[in-house]
C-alpha cells in the first residue's frame, strides 16, 4: 500500500483522538437505544482473524470507521428524507482520502491497493448507511477514466473526483434495456468533429448529484452485432440538452440519489469520447467483474452486520421467562446463518485476493455476486423474523437493512444473468 495512504490514516487518527462514542451512538440514526456495538470488523461472526489484511489496512480501517461514525451515521436519517446525501460529505470523504483509493497516484488518485478499497466497502456496510455512493464513484466510474481516458481527460477529472468536488455516475440502464446492454437505444451521431447525443437513462445512482456521467450509447447501428457498435461518452452537468429528471423514490436505499437522465441533441466535442469509438461494450465487459465483486463484498459485509445486530438483540430480548437466544429453534437458526455467512466470506475474500493480482475472471465474479446477494436477502429475512414485530419497525436497523438488500440481486446484472454467465463458462470448450 502506498505510504501516502498510511500517513493520511495516521494523521486522521491523531486528529480524531477523542474517546470512542458509547455503543448507542453507533446506531444513533436508528432511534433504538442500548444496542450493543458491532464488534471489530476483523472478528465479525467469530471467524477469527482474516489474513488478507495487513496492519496498515487495520490502521486505515480505524480512520474509515471513525469517518462513518462521525460524518455519515448522524446525518443519514435526514438524507433519507431528502433522497440524497449532502455535497459536503463528499468533500469530507475526499479530504480524508476515501475516494479514488485504488486509482494510481500518477492519475491523481490515492494509490492504495484493492484491499484498502475493500476496507471502505466493508465499513460502509457495517455502518448500515447506504446513502453515499462513494464506491460507485470511486470503484466503478473512475476506473473507466483511468484505464481508457486520454491524458487530458484523466488530468481534468480524476483529481477533482478524488477530492469529492466532481461526483461521478455511469448511465447504462434504459427504460427498455437493463441487464441486456446490447439493447441500448441511446445513440450518438457524428456532426462534423462533434457528436450529437440523444436518448434517456433510468435508475442512475448518483444521477441527481452528478457532475460527470459516463453514458453508454450506440454509435454504429450497422455493426455486425450490437456489441460492436457501442461507445462511451463523458457528459458534464450543465451541457445544453442534458436534463436530469426526477429523483426516483425507491423501496430501499432511500438516501442514495437515483435519477432519470435525458439527452436531447446534446452536442459533445470530440474529446468527450472515452476510449476508442465502438469499443464501449468491450470496456464494459472488462470493468463489470469489479462491479460485481463490489456488490458481493457489500452483500457479505451487510450479512455480517445483520447477524451481529440480531445476535445482540436475541441475547437481550426475553420471552417465556428467558432470553430468546436460549430458545433452541433460535439457536439453530443462528447456527445456520453463521455457517452460511462464514463460508461465503471465505469465498469473497478469495475473490478479493484474486482480483488484487488481476486473476479474477468473469465467472468467479458472477458467482460471488449471485451467491452473496442471495444470501444477503435470505439473512435479512431471517434476521427480521428473529426480531419479531420490532424487526418491522423502521427505527430498528434490521428493517432498513432488509429493504436495502432487495436491489442487490438486481443491479450490476440480475442474478439470472449471473447464472447465464457462470453456465457459459462451465460449458465453454475453451
Swiss-Prot record:
Q: What is the effect of changing residue 318 to R?
A: Reduces activity by 37%; reduces activity by 80%
Protein name per the record: Long-chain specific acyl-CoA dehydrogenase, mitochondrial
Species the sequence originates in = Mus musculus
Pathway it works in = Lipid metabolism; mitochondrial fatty acid beta-oxidation
- Post-translational modification, as annotated: Acetylation at Lys-318 and Lys-322 in proximity of the cofactor-binding sites strongly reduces catalytic activity. These sites are deacetylated by SIRT3.
> Where found in the cell?
Mitochondrion matrix
Where substrate binds, per the record, is at: 179, 227-228, 282, 289-292, 412-413
Q: What does this protein do?
A: Long-chain specific acyl-CoA dehydrogenase is one of the acyl-CoA dehydrogenases that catalyze the first step of mitochondrial fatty acid beta-oxidation, an aerobic process breaking down fatty acids into acetyl-CoA and allowing the production of energy from fats.
